[in-house]
Structures are given as C-alpha cells and as structure tokens.
Amino acid sequence: MAFQKQSSGGGEAALAILRIGTGATLFLRHGWEKQPMHWAQFMAHFPNPIHIGAHASFFIAFVSDFVCSLLLTLGIWTRWVALFSFCNILVAWALVHRFAFFGRGPGSDHGEVMVLYLVALLTLVIHGSTAFSVDSVRGR
C-alpha cells in the first residue's frame, strides 16, 4: 500500500510544518496582542500565577508568545525557545486555567488548544529543529 511507504524527507518536512505552524499561530494569536504598544492594557489585569508580580509574569508571557514564537517560526534556538514556551503555557494551563479542557466555566474556553500547543512544543523540544531552519544553516 502507498500509505506504508516511507519517504526519507517527509519527517523533516512534517516537523518543519509543525514548528512553523506552532510558532506562527502562537505569535498571531497571543504574541501580536502583547507587542509593546499594548503593554499598558495588559499590565492592569494580567494574572500572577507564580507570585512574582503581574509585570514579571507579563514579561515572561511576552518573551514566550512574542519573542520565542518568532524564533520558533524561523527555527532559531528551536529546542530552547520551545522549552521556554512549553513551560509558560504549562504554568498558564495549570495555575490560571486550572487544567480546564472542555470549556465548562469561566476561563476554560480553550484548554484543548493549550494541550495541542503543549504536545507540539514538547515534540519540538525532543526533536529540535529540522533541515528547514536557521539552526540547520548555522550548523546547530
């Protein structure tokens, strides 16, 4: 059967699509809204799940959702930025959204999306970048 046939470059291409898709959607949905011109509106009500202050918590989310998502999309320091974003999303899912998954109640309307991000990011932490990344051009 054709489905059983493995291609040599398919895995690399699939992981590149996963990396680019994860980074781009994280940036477009969560990073773009955290750009510096919008910081004032976030500071007033940003959660403080690990008790380091709302400003510090927002800065961690900004680095994860804005900076790391762009680096992930380009394939720069893939494992490290995926790990940073994974940790940030895991903390948000656990401590802010209380592991909500099915969307029953306030703040639980996108738990399944958080799980999908976590699975994709963990895959990228384990595998790293692919041949289709800046890391591979730089020889890392």
Residue ranges of model-derived segments:
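Extended, low-polarity transmembrane helix blocks
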Residues: M1-K34, H55-V63, V67-L70, L74-R140
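Membrane-interface interhelical connector segments
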Residues: K34-G53
